[in-house]
Amino acid sequence: MRLHEILKHLCEPAHMPPVNPEIAGVVYDSRAVTPGALFVAYRGFHTDGHAYIPQALERGAAAVVYEDPAWDGRVPVPALRVPNARVALAPLAAAFYGHPGRRMRIVGVTGTDGKTTTTFLTSVALEAGGAITGLMGTVDFKIGERMWTNDSRQSTPEAPEVQALLRDMAEAGCSYAVIEATSHALSARWNRLAGSAFDIAVFTNVTQEHLDFHGTVEQYRRDKARLFEMLAEFNDAAAPFKQRKIAVVNADDPHHRMFLDAAPVSAERLTYAVHAHADVRAEDVRSTRDGLRFRVTTPWGAADARLRLTGDFNVWNALAALTVACAEGVPLERCLAALERVPGVRGRMERIEAGQPFTVLVDYAHTPGAFEKLFRIVRPLTEGQVIAVFGSAGERDRAKRPLQGEIAGRFCDLVIVTDEDPRLEDRAAIIAEIAAGAEAVGKRIGETCLCIPDRALAIRTAFAYARPGDIVLLLGKGHEGSIIYGTTPVPWDEAAEARRALAELGYGG
């Protein structure tokens, strides 16, 4: 594809560089530049991409898009200065890959909690109707029957990776792509998902998270609501299957109205809930250690649901998936039959069984809202102890740390605070901030609140304290494959570490 064909989405012909080379890729990392690439240089949090323009040129970049006026006239290949190169990256990538989102129905799922499970369940429910789906989520990527681990530690990849995956999905015959849409990716500052051509937007819930990035809770909500605004991005009469837009929201969330209001007027609006009046509703919910039972009523019929998923919050996740699939024409009975076969999502209320007399669950919960939901569900499931092992990420929202400690302190008999990606922060200081929250609600440091930075030792300590019938929760890491110390990811597998610790106690042999 020629440079001018890509740039026409950013500027008028009069402002195009005079030379129009063939472009072989759109790249933002100079280390990934290959001959013929268009290099996009922008200012990041830790580094300034403009400093790597010389390296990109040495590696064969054929053109450069940049934002710093200091580089005017200094780039010896065709170059274009834009107000914000990071924002420009997504439309450039979408153009280069031929706007693949326009060839499929695109489903976006956003919210503080539940995105990963909802995305996975939505893919399963759509496939129950015979569709081939692609998926982008925190845990896995999927194209048709091929699934592989997302090792990037990004729930929503950078724009070129998003568009490349969409291209691969379209070429593999997928009729749907289901994308986990984070607030960072949706924000106007990063704009990673522009050009994806969304058709269905799903909202799960919103609580406090990522205030270090968004600044305020209100801005955080507005950034998430951009997914619903993006339903208006592409509506071409030449593609009739893309003209129907659907907004799906959790009516139990007090902020759901702002998400409905953000959708274009022409979009269909569907709600789901457990407590509030809604189009799709679960009633008579029963939760046990083994799964969920509930009655679901919908505009497409009513039925009894029996899921193998643990935790009441998965009722909302399942309702969201059912709403999307049924709205797209999949019969309710087929959706439920498919969802009933799902054993769970890796790192999401994942049960670790080795014959031990207590329950061990691995979950990605790492926000105050997720803690509140999780502990309220787990506490009634045992008359014994609830023991929680968790930490809080370094260089992220500090305000949530004491809240995590406070919530865990209220619901758990024993709180064990440990490392979770301290990065360049003082690991002891992070742990102390969390422990202060637990101490504020009556936990005693060294007795009912233990501070053990070594996560492997923290897990073993929890198991040593556990008695028959207790529940041990290993929170925050979930599916992730590393713990970041400084800038170095150290390999880590929470479920595998739990199994090793149980084996040391004589279980699982």
From Swiss-Prot:
UDP-N-acetyl-alpha-D-muramoyl-L-alanyl-D-glutamate binds at S30, S155, T156, T182, R192. One of its GO terms (biological process) is cell wall organization. The keyword S-adenosyl-L-methionine does not apply. The modification N6-carboxylysine is found at K224. ATP binds at G111, T112, D113, G114, K115, T116, T117. One of its GO terms (cellular component) is cytoplasm. InterPro entries: Mur-like_cat_sf (IPR036565), Mur_ligase_C (IPR004101), Mur_ligase_C_dom_sf (IPR036615), Mur_ligase_cen (IPR013221), Mur_ligase_N (IPR000713), MurE/MurF_N (IPR035911), UDP-N-AcMur-Glu-dNH2Pim_ligase (IPR005761). It is found in: Cytoplasm. GO terms for molecular function: acid-amino acid ligase activity; ATP binding; magnesium ion binding. The keyword Ion transport does not apply. Keywords: ATP-binding, Cell cycle, Cell division, Cell shape, Cell wall biogenesis/degradation, Cytoplasm, Ligase, Nucleotide-binding, Peptidoglycan synthesis. It is an enzyme of class 6 (ligase). Catalyzes the addition of an amino acid to the nucleotide precursor UDP-N-acetylmuramoyl-L-alanyl-D-glutamate (UMAG) in the biosynthesis of bacterial cell-wall peptidoglycan. This is UDP-N-acetylmuramyl-tripeptide synthetase. It comes from Roseiflexus sp. (strain RS-1).
